[in-house]
Amino acid sequence: MKNTFLNTVKGSLIISCQALPNEPLHSSFIMSRMALAAKGAGAAGIRANSVVDIQAIQDEVDLPLIGLSKVDYPASPVYITPTIKEMRAVAATGCAVVACDVTGQPRPNGEKLAEIVATMRTEFPDTLLMADTDTIENVKVADKLGFDIIGTTMHGYTPATTGANIADNDFAYLKEVLQATSRPVIAEGKVDTPEKMKRCLDLGCHAVVVGGAITRPLEIAQRFISAL
């Protein structure tokens, strides 16, 4: 079966529907309803965390999914689909894309990213792989490893990029990413206004993922409260 994800989301908004255990909306049911709202608004796809959330969302909407699994391992800073175990579990849901950390940091159990990619290509040949990158160097690593999609997800969230924002200097970093790879780039991370989303698309991004600015009411409310 041909994966039609890239055609479906081109030039569009993907909404990330995630809530971690310490957040008020942590519930697979709530995430499924959030996805329904996203679909109603016109989102072209959903990004979701954990097998149970992915399955609940699949039961609710027919939008294509970017799936991932956030797991904390004690001896590794990598937490987005960090090992082959999580990669397999997410891919087994049938989601169109599996996203994982590509930040060059050591993975749990000494696993190697190149081996994970090779295994996924053999076991799930129809599943697209998205690299959640943080730096130009790691964009190039992901490109060389053959990831289908390059994401800017981790820019600003790793020790090497602390404090960075995708919108800095008129999106200078994003422009570099687009120059560094010919693969589809999905902008993600701190894209918190419609204007920033549009700018990412105008610069040449294939699609844009927006999460917290839409689906995390605690964070949204805090922005208003902090202005008082």
Residue ranges of each PLM-predicted region?
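Conserved N-terminal beta1-alpha1 strand-loop-helix module at the mouth
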Residues: 1-92, 123, 129, 137-149
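Active-site-adjacent beta->alpha loops and helix N-cap segments on the catalytic face
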Residues: 24-28, 47-66, 77-85, 102-120, ...
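Conserved hydrophobic beta-strand within the GNAT/NAT acetyltransferase core sheet
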Residues: 48, 129-131, 185-189
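A generic, well-ordered mixed alpha/beta core segment in the N-terminal half of proteins
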Residues: 94, 98-100
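Glycine-rich beta-strand-to-loop/alpha-helix junction loops that act as flexible
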Residues: 186-191, 209-213
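C-terminal binding/interaction regions
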Residues: 205
